[in-house]
A protein has these predicted regions:
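Membrane-embedded alpha-helical bundles of multi-pass transporters/translocases
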Residues: 1-199
Length: 199
């Protein structure tokens, strides 16, 4: 999901949200869209203490889904998309800052049961997955836009991308998140219920 978002954001800012190399759309998209993470450093702990990490993360993914839906209302409207990105990022605060803590708890539990630490193995697996997914997402994205008729800009001409290319870019940047966030929230809730039964 994040890999598809990263692969398509440059194209989304250039061909859907703004105009080619306008110099500000991508900066606004990242700077304003990710700004709540700065405040999130302070807010995350009280929220997670009040709700619990699992509930805070599940609720955050639901809020992130709402933010993505705001973006999908009008994917070419800069103000609306920025508002949606802010809501999405606020929703992602618990997962952004708590996922490492939860991984640490899981590693401690593995050590308690097996008497062995597996930090190195888990780090290696995570790095492999991140690297592979980045490459796979870029391949899927480039294949998709090339098959749908993407026209690269030249020194003399800045083309207008057809609707199919624009819709594919929107799907990669926003649509994939809209599909994933509710599923992740449900998985988080299911994991919490399973954890309660095991205790």
């Amino acid at each position: 999901m994040n890999a598809m978002f990263s692969a398509g954001t440059f194209y989304y800012c250039n061909w859907v949200l703004g105009s080619y190399n306008d110099g500000y759309t991508q900066a606004l998209f990242y700077a304003l869209g990710q700004a709540p993470l700065g405040i999130g450093i302070v807010l995350c702990r009280p929220i997670c203490n009040k709700l619990g990490r699992g509930r805070a993360m599940a609720g955050g993914f639901v809020l992130a889904f709402a933010g993505v839906l705001i973006c999908l209302l009008s994917p070419g409207n800069l103000a609306l998309v920025l508002a949606g990105q802010v809501v999405r990022t606020i929703g992602l605060i618990p997962s952004t800052f708590m996922i490492s803590s939860m991984l640490g708890d899981a590693l401690d539990e593995v050590e308690q049961v097996s008497k062995k630490r597996c930090d190195g193995f888990s780090s290696s697996v995570m790095n492999c997955i991140t690297t592979l997914m980045g490459g796979i997402a870029l391949c899927i994205f480039n294949f998709g836009i090339s098959q749908l008729g993407y026209q690269a800009p030249t020194e003399t001409m800045i083309p207008v991308q057809n609707d199919a290319v624009q819709n594919f870019i929107i799907f990669c940047v926003i649509g994939v998140q809209a599909l994933c966030y509710p599923v992740i929230a449900l998985l988080q809730l299911a994991a919490m219920k399973k954890g309660k039964k095991m205790v």
